[in-house]
Design a protein with these regions (language model features):
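Short beta-strand-centered aromatic/proline hotspots
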Residues: 147-153
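Short coil-to-beta-strand transition motifs
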Residues: 131-133, 140-147
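Acidic-enriched and Gly/Ser
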Residues: 2-136, 161-183
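A generic structural signal for beta-strand entry/edge sites
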Residues: 157-159
Length: 183
C-alpha cells in the first residue's frame, strides 16, 4: 500500500514538472565559445538565443563585415528546470547566471527587447559599469569630453542629466551612457 502511494506521489511530481512553462536563462560560456555552444545546444533541441551584432573588422589589407556576440561569453536558453543538467553537460557551458544560488530567469519581454535591438541598425555598445544617482562622472568621449559633474538621472541609454557643481545648474546630455565614467 505504501509503495502505491509513493508511486502516485512521484507521478504527480513528474506531471507537475512536465507542465512547467519554460523560461529564459542566461548561460555563461567559455571565452569565445558562444557560437560553438549555441550550435551544440540547438543540436540538443534546446531553444537558444545568441544576440549577434554586425560590425566591421579591419585588417591591414582588408575590411570585413563580421557578426560577433553582443554579450561576450553569454547566451540565452529557454528551458524547464528538468533540462538544466542537459545544458550543464553541453561542452563549453560554464554555468547558469544565478541569483541567490538559483539560475535567474529572464523575462520574455527583455529577450524580445534584445531581439528588437539586434534587428535594428542601431550601433550598440555594451558597458558593464553601473551608474547610480549621485555618482561623480566625467564625459570621456564626444563634444563634451572632460565635463565633470554629479549624475542626477539617467533616462535610458542615451539621455543623462549631469549637475555641474560650480554652475549650480543641471545639463541634460543626449549622449550614450558609455561616454561616461565614474570618478
Amino acid at each position: 500500500m505504501v509503495g502505491k502511494k509513493q508511486l502516485k506521489a512521484e507521478e504527480k511530481i513528474v506531471n507537475i514538472i512536465k507542465h512547467v512553462d519554460p523560461k529564459w536563462y542566461a548561460v555563461y560560456t567559455n571565452p569565445r565559445a558562444e557560437k560553438l555552444v549555441f550550435g551544440r545546444l540547438i543540436e540538443e533541441g534546446i531553444d537558444t538565443f545568441l544576440p549577434l551584432q554586425k560590425t566591421y573588422r579591419t585588417w591591414s589589407d582588408r575590411k570585413k563585415l563580421i557578426e560577433k556576440p553582443l554579450l561576450s561569453s553569454y547566451i540565452f536558453v529557454k528551458v524547464v528546470p528538468v533540462d538544466f543538467p542537459k545544458v550543464y553537460k553541453t561542452m563549453g557551458v560554464v554555468k547558469f547566471v544565478t541569483f541567490e544560488g538559483q539560475p535567474a530567469s529572464i523575462p520574455q519581454k527583455q529577450i524580445d527587447n534584445l531581439r528588437l535591438l539586434i534587428d535594428s541598425d542601431a550601433e550598440i555598445e555594451v558597458t558593464s559599469e553601473k551608474f547610480e544617482k549621485g555618482d561623480n562622472v566625467e564625459v570621456i568621449n564626444g563634444s563634451m569630453i572632460g565635463l565633470i559633474g554629479e549624475l542626477i538621472k539617467t533616462g535610458g541609454k542615451k539621455r543623462v542629466i549631469v549637475r555641474i557643481d560650480r554652475l549650480d545648474q543641471n545639463i541634460i546630455l543626449t549622449i550614450p551612457v558609455t561616454f561616461l565614467r565614474k570618478i
